[in-house]
């Protein structure tokens, strides 16, 4: 039997159908069936994790310098941050920071404000003081290559420089923290030299679920490991694969995206984790 619709009814039915199609399409995108999942997630508020944690404590000293790296065959810029009330000559454990792909030795300081989060975390009665040190990966991808070994640069060249500044660089007193490409690099460094590190933290690590970083997690079982990733991050599934491969690790996939806001939100808990793991 034919059904005659008024113009208003036809328009209403069309609008309802369009709404259902859009909602269904968004659902398919979020489920990974259609491309654009992360862009749609951002539009839907998946990145809205609030402002970065407030920092009310003035940071401690910062130092930037460079050295000629034989391991990399080039000059390498680096930086060091001490907590408030400390400075060169103080015997503190140290955490190496590995920047993301678009970063350099100043990114943890200028973009992520890690020296402010360090000052906030290391206040009286809070966590054990530690220093932060970082170097410019300069397009290495934090992957060793013939004639360019960023890991040898960190362990065999930067650490002795830090020791000369009074920092404690024995294996039980050095940690590593990285973001994105640097998060993957932190895992690779720890898998390559687990005896040189006391803890590893990877934020939004840029790895594949079937990649060597996941396959190599057996070498990390004796280390304290913390991994954080946003649920709307392209590497969330790989982070879940890391969690399955390394059940001893502290792994969290929470609301957030692959961005600096999410990374800063993780900083206080990550610094507490590192301070607890590094030796006195």
Where are these regions (language model features)?
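Non-catalytic cap/lid and distal C-terminal segments of serine-dependent acyl enzymes
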Residues: 2-5, 9-280
């Amino acid at each position: 039997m034919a059904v005659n619709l008024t113009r208003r009814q036809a328009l209403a039915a069309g609008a309802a159908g369009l709404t259902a199609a859009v909602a269904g399409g968004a659902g398919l995108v979020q489920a990974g069936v259609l491309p654009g999942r992360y862009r749609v997630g951002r539009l839907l508020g998946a990145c809205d994790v609030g402002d970065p944690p407030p920092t009310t404590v003035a940071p401690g000293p910062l130092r930037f310098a460079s050295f000629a790296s034989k391991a990399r065959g080039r000059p390498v810029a680096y930086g060091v941050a001490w907590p408030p009330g400390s400075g060169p000559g103080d015997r503190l454990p140290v955490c190496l920071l590995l920047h993301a792909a678009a970063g350099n030795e100043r990114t943890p300081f200028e973009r992520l404000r890690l020296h402010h989060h360090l000052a906030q975390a290391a206040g009286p009665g809070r966590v054990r003081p530690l220093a932060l040190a970082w170097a410019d990966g300069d397009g290495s991808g934090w992957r060793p290559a013939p004639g360019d070994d960023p890991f040898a640069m960190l362990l065999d060249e930067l650490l002795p420089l830090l020791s000369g500044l009074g920092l404690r660089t024995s294996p039980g007193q050095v940690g590593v923290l990285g973001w994105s490409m640097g998060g993957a690099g932190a895992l690779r460094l720890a898998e390559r030299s687990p005896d040189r590190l006391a803890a590893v933290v990877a934020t939004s690590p840029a790895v594949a679920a079937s990649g060597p970083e996941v396959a190599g997690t057996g070498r990390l079982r004796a280390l304290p490991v913390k991994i954080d990733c946003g649920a709307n991050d392209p590497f969330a599934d790989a982070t879940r694969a890391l969690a399955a491969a390394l059940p001893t690790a502290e792994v969290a996939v929470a609301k957030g995206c692959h961005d600096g806001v999410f990374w800063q939100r993780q900083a206080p808990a990550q610094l507490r984790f590192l301070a607890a793991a590094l030796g006195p």
